[in-house]
Amino acid sequence: MSPFKTTDNPNEEEWELAHALRSDGFPYDRMGYLDCLGINWMALQSEDLILPFALGRSKWGFKQAFCPFGAQRLGPLGRAADDPERLREALDALPRLLRLRLSMSRPTGWNADRGWHWRKAGWERWYSAPNYELRLDGSYEALHQGYSSQTRRNLAKASGNQLWEYSNPEELWNYFVQNQGGKYAIPKGYEQAMKTAMYHLLHQGRGAVWAALGEGNQWLAGIFVAFSGDRALLLFSATTPEGRESNSMTWLINEFITMAVGRWKVLDFEGTSAEGLARFYQGFGAVNVPYLRWERWNAPWQLP
């Protein structure tokens, strides 16, 4: 008999206890945050591990388990969160849906990436997704020494005539749509979900919005940072053309780093497949700490 059970009504108290046992806590592992995304949630649970996932339908109409936008990686939680064998057992115990595509933290010792292969009556694969993190140990001066020469030049150009101010999710989202919205496919419902999630974290004291303002209080760049344990996570950002010209995002993140040193241990820039963004994060000394993506198609005759 499997030690795992699937529940469509996760116990929030149990979930919080499991979250507390995880060495790296992420804001989107908490049920309060996940509920803001407006998704139907389920979890695979045992005594020592919880694996959350969203349940929905694809654009072709079939049921699937997935991780939505706004929750880059979900779990695993619990004492066995870093045990690769237990994670493999959990993945095998997931409901027999046609498609499963999950993102999660990569346990220590997880096997190397593997392309599509046949396993237990289904095709599956797992691969590493990039995620950039900056350790905030030590002094700001030491961190600054780790900046790339390009980042230091951009920072020198950006200094002066910029102010650090609190902003709000509505303003940040509007500037994102105006200036970056055409570059990205924004899923239906994502706007309301992301705003709700940001306001939830603000009200919980687990997030803040900051902006760089130029002359005449001109809005140049903004970031939303979520806080979870020892981790500060750059969840959302936007910049204007004027902000790009004046290197305002470089200035704004540097200002955040000066404040964050001694408060958190990690600044998590989140993942990106865009080479330009990756270089930007690496310019502050961030290194790639990949997470795990797993995808499976079950054979139709295995479906309930």
Please tell me what each predicted stretch does:
Residues 72-80, 242:
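The substrate-binding groove and active-site-proximal loops of carbohydrate-active enzymes
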Residues 70, 94-96, 125-128, 228, ...:
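A short, structural micro-pattern
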Residues 57-73:
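Conserved acyl-donor/pantetheine-binding loop and adjacent beta-alpha core of acyl/acetyltransferases
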Residues 102-112, 269-277:
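Conserved beta-strand-loop-alpha-helix junction that forms the acyl-donor binding cleft
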Residues 2-47, 52-61, 112-244, 283:
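A conserved beta-strand-loop-helix scaffold within acyl/acetyltransferase catalytic domains
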Residues 73, 99, 129-131:
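Extracellular structured ligand-interaction cores
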Residues 86-92, 196-303:
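Aromatic (often tryptophan-rich) hydrophobic motifs at membrane interfaces
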Residues 45-52, 98-105, 164-167, 266-269, ...:
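A structural signal for short, well-ordered beta-strand segments and their strand-loop junctions
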